[in-house]
Amino acid sequence: MIVCPFKDLGRYAPVLPGLEEAVKVAEGLTDLTPRTIPLSDGNRIMIVAGTSRSPVNALSEAHRNYLDLQYIVKGEETVGWAPLDTLEVAEEYNAEKDISMHAGPVEFVRIPAGHCYVVYPEDGHMPGVQLDEPHDFVKLVVKLKV
């Protein structure tokens, strides 16, 4: 897992194919209406608006074919993280949706506006949660093929 200010994300372009294009598109966005923006090579950016939720009874997710880059544009969220091999499978892998769901303890990291995180296939992650009170957020979820 990588956590950093969005402005510093470009340094990871050599090890994240498709990142340079995604950052350029993200930097040019002025309309944050929820939608999906296709990128080259099957990559995409999803603009998501929501309110953080309680982590109680929440499951972590994992992906095999795409990594998640989640950039908090407005508001904040907390993400839970754990090595995938420490979590128990709660819902088997769905190849069509590229997702499996997992149960188990996670560590929490607060992600403020202007920051982002990247999770790889070996990272279980619980996005969009709160540890105190609900927070509204707008974020870009970038899916990059691995």
Residue ranges and their predicted role:
Residues 1-47, 57-62:
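A short, N-terminal "cap"/entry segment at the start of jelly-roll beta-barrel domains
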Residues 40-42, 62-66, 72-74, 94, ...:
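Short connector loops at helix/strand junctions that flank enzyme active sites
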Residues 45-63, 73-87:
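Conserved short histidine dyad/triad with adjacent acidic residue
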Residues 65, 101-106:
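Short alpha-helix capping/helix-loop boundary micro-motifs
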Residues 65-77, 85, 92-98, 143-144:
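Short, conserved beta-strand element in jelly-roll/cupin
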Residues 69, 116-118, 134-146:
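A short hydrophobic beta-strand segment most commonly corresponding to one strand
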Residues 69, 107-108:
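Short, surface-exposed secondary-structure edge patches
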Residues 110-129:
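Conserved metal-binding segment of the jelly-roll/cupin
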